[in-house]
Amino acid sequence: VYHMLVDGGQYEGKRYLSLETCQLFMNKKSRISRRALGFDRPDPQPDKGPCADEAPKEVVGHTGFTGTCAWADPKNGLVFVFISNRIYPRPFDHKGLMTLKIRPRIQQLMYQALKK
């Protein structure tokens, strides 16, 4: 799905979604929320957002309860996926992953590496 969003609805040369459908799901839909249809987006205040400060405003993604996240960046042609298990061994002890902002920090390292 994220590759299709990056490629405007195509995957490996085959069209699955129209460009208009991709844009419908990727564009912000509310004045009171940063979210698009089914996807999260960067927060206007970067330090409060779910993704890296350097992520362009066009990125869309999802952060899952178990700690995973995925982001589609059509501007740079990137898909970022981070897989983790924040619920083991204690499902409601979110100190590490959430407090330390591990997911956006790893994504930030990716953007910094791309600049080199």
Role assignments for model-derived ranges:
Residues 2-116:
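Catalytic loop of the DD-peptidase/beta-lactamase superfamily, centered on the K-T-G motif
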